[in-house]
């Protein structure tokens, strides 16, 4: 317990403004003569409304300098406002704090005191636990009597090259079975069936044998995923006959590793879970304002400087761990390791290099290339930065993009690179002589066209490297990129439909249903955001993609699939990550895989009970909805 405590209390709120009192208590025997309070909060503070001391904010990192002495046993109090609607969750408050005087002191932060804390949890139906708990639900499954019991040292006969990596995954996932690859037909056989469609599989488990049929490596991986769920934490598989295939070809999850850095073992654990629930794409968000996480050999500064943040570092402390140097990055060798690990489980790894906004880490690392020192434009990003956008008018920007994209394209075998392109703030580039000159040269009338100008260059560069460009829905702003760009819609499904009508292929990732950083319940103590929605498990499960679009509408063919996403401003530990992921990841898996006519909420809950036992047996944290 610290000798200093910080309390934040809502004292007044309207539809668009909230006023707070903040109290710092000194429970020590020390008197602080000259001191500064540092704290982090994800909301934007109106510094001009502060009543005591001098308040400033950069991103989530706030500095309060006081001229008043803080006596031992005394308190310091101030008030300030946020231009925000009424707050609903305690995590809207201060995340962490510390004081610097003659030395640095830790500060205990109490939960935000809300005016009217709300608690309105959605009840979960009481259902019996299923005997077979496969998620997502197969299109056809017949459960027979009896079980197949694995004897130690069983061999798997692999009848085709496409099945080998799935067999190796099974061996690795269940080491207690002592499995190995066999050279001749036996009790466990993986066979190719060329008549099966892409990603499909058939699994037959009898008391004497296990036979898995598929036509490609992803189909075999999906079949192994079902077999692993049949086994659970044991050595027996219920006898079943399964014929299965996905509704959507693309089923992905995006993980933000910039806001907080996730260790390599956690990346692999996420990939394991994706494979078990038959996802086939891992979208790796590797760069953002708060950290550059991928080694680029052409620019070692990106990780020497851009991967680390702290109070006195070029990249300012943000969110959690603000009292010390924090960060990390993945070497190219580690990334190759992740790619191979994912491939063995039927998953393709898609890198994201977020441009032209969300680039503060890159700009701070490479100011000699990326900083336009004569740009007087005034803007503020959604995350409260005023210096996080690349300039389309600097030669250094294109040198940076060329070298980074060349290394990324060589490193990742997937045919796609995601370039972000979201949340470029209003006002950017408007007071830059260099940018205005580019607009004049090309006949642009709106500064927003400069985003399209830059992204068209990136699209052409990626095409020359054999890659197709992916981007958030803002990638088509400025009307410069071609319809070869694939759009990921995050603000709403309607945005995806509009892009598809324009001729773009799209991936559905509406924050209202698929964002795993949204709070999971109507309870003030829950962690998460809610700008898109409070997203309980039931709400995620009942997402019906394109439900208002006729099945015969050509737009249906423009939709590749569905993706879940986890932004990590509030997620700084393995336990919190897993808590936010499970069990909504399972619900979204069923949305993406299973036909709507085969889905049933109570049946899902019945299977989920068995699935959660499997998570617990593997030591994986989750939020228990029951």
Task: Give each language-model segment a name.
Residues 50-87, 462:
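Intrinsically disordered, low-complexity Pro/Gly/Ser/Thr-rich segments with frequent PxxP/GP/PP motifs
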Residues 12, 23-29:
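Asparagine-centered strand-capping/turn motif at beta-strand->loop junctions
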Residues 468-485, 489-626:
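Flexible, acidic glycine-rich loops studded with aromatic residues
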Residues 29-58:
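Short acidic, flexible loop segments centered on an aromatic residue
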Residues 196-388, 392-398, 407-416, 457, ...:
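Feature activates predominantly on carbohydrate-active enzymes
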Residues 71-79, 86-242, 246, 469-476, ...:
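Acidic, contiguous N-terminal accessory segments
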Residues 362-368, 379-485, 490-498:
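Active-site neighborhood of glycoside hydrolase catalytic domains
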Residues 22, 73, 156, 216, ...:
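Conserved, mostly hydrophobic/aromatic
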């Amino acid at each position: 317990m610290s000798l200093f405590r910080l309390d934040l209390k809502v004292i007044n709120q309207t539809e668009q403004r909230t006023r707070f009192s903040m109290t710092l208590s000194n429970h020590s025997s020390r008197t602080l003569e000259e001191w500064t309070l540092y704290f982090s909060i994800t909301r934007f503070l109106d510094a001009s409304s502060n009543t005591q001391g001098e308040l400033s904010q950069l991103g989530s990192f706030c500095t309060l300098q006081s001229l008043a002495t803080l006596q031992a046993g005394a308190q310091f109090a101030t008030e300030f406002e946020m231009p925000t609607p009424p707050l609903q969750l305690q995590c809207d408050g201060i995340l962490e704090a510390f004081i610097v005087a003659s030395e640095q002191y830790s500060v205990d932060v109490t939960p935000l005191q809300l005016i009217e804390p709300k608690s309105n949890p959605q009840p979960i139906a009481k259902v019996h636990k299923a005997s077979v708990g496969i998620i997502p639900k197969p299109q056809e499954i017949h459960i027979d009597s009896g079980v197949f019991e694995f004897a130690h040292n069983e061999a798997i006969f692999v009848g085709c090259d496409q099945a080998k990596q799935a067999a190796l995954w099974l061996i690795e996932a269940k080491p207690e079975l002592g499995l190995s690859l066999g050279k001749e037909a036996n009790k466990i056989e993986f066979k190719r069936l060329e008549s099966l469609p892409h990603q499909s599989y058939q699994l037959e488990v009898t008391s004497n044998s296990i036979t898995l049929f598929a036509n490609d490596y992803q189909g075999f991986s999906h079949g192994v995923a079902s077999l692993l769920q049949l086994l659970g934490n044991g050595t027996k598989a219920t006898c079943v006959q399964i014929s299965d295939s996905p509704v959507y070809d693309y089923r992905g999850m995006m993980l933000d590793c910039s806001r907080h850095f996730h260790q390599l073992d956690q990346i692999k654990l996420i990939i394991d879970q994706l494979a078990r629930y038959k996802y086939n794409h891992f979208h790796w968000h590797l760069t953002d304002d708060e950290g550059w996480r991928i080694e680029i050999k052409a620019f070692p500064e990106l990780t020497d400087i851009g991967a680390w943040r702290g109070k006195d570092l070029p990249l300012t402390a943000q969110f959690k761990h603000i009292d010390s140097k924090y960060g990390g990055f993945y070497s190219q060798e580690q990334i190759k390791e992740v790619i191979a690990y994912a491939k063995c489980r039927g998953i393709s790894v898609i890198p994201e290099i977020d441009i032209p906004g969300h680039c503060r880490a890159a700009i701070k690392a490479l100011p000699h290339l990326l900083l336009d020192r004569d740009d007087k434009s005034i803007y503020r990003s959604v995350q409260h930065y005023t210096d996080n956008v690349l300039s389309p008018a600097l030669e250094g920007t294109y040198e940076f993009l060329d070298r980074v994209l060349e290394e990324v394209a060589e490193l990742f075998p997937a045919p796609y690179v995601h370039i972000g392109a979201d949340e470029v703030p209003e006002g950017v580039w408007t007071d830059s002589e260099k940018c205005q000159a580019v607009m004049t040269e090309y006949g642009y009338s709106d500064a927003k066209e400069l985003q399209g100008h830059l992204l068209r260059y990136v699209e052409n560069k990626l095409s020359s490297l054999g890659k197709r460009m992916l981007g958030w829905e803002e990638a088509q702003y400025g009307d410069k990129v071609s319809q070869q760009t694939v759009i990921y819609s995050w603000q709403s499904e309607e945005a995806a439909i509009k892009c598809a009508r324009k001729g773009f292929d799209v991936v559905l990732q509406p924050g209202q249903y698929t964002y795993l950083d949204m709070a999971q319940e109507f309870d003030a103590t829950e962690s998460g955001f809610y700008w898109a929605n409070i997203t309980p498990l039931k709400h995620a499960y009942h997402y019906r993609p394109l439900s208002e679009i006729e099945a015969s509408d050509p737009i249906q063919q423009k939709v590749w699939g569905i993706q879940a996403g986890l932004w990590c401003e509030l997620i700084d530990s393995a336990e919190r990550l897993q808590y936010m992921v499970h069990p909504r990841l399972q619900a979204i898996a069923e949305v993406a895989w299973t036909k709507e006519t085969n889905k049933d909420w109570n049946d899902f809950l019945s299977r989920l009970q068995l699935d959660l036992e499997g998570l617990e047996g593997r030591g994986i944290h989750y939020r228990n909805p029951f």
